[in-house]
Amino acid sequence: MNQERLYTVLRGPHISEKSTVIADGAGQVVFQVAPDANKKEIKAAVEKLFDVQVTGVRTVNAKGKRKRFGMIRGRRRDWKKAYVTLAEGQDIDFLGGE
């Protein structure tokens, strides 16, 4: 797998109320990922960038919402998120606190 591709797969963490509950209880982390990324690429990218062991990946394609920009109707772009299950006892800390 191309090393440059691994750095472009993950767009960033998806921080929401649901993702924080899942991170505390189920040992999962939620990422926004590239729309053309597959599960193998997501797993390899998380393992390489965060030095953790991934046991499973689930993906969801989210449709962009319809919005109005003044008088113009438009819509936000579609995006993809991945629920990454980490091995027992492993964690990713996005806030960097001690």
From Swiss-Prot:
UniProt entry keywords in alphabetical sequence: Ribonucleoprotein, Ribosomal protein, RNA-binding, rRNA-binding
GO cellular component, one term: ribosome
Annotated PROSITE patterns: RIBOSOMAL_L23 (PS00050)
InterPro entries on file: Nucleotide-bd_a/b_plait_sf, Ribosomal_uL23-like, Ribosomal_uL23/eL15/eS24_sf, Ribosomal_uL23_CS
UniProt keyword annotation of rRNA-binding present: yes
Domain of life assignment: Bacteria
Family that this chain belongs to: Belongs to the universal ribosomal protein uL23 family.
Protein name in the entry: Large ribosomal subunit protein uL23
Gene symbol of the encoding locus: rplW
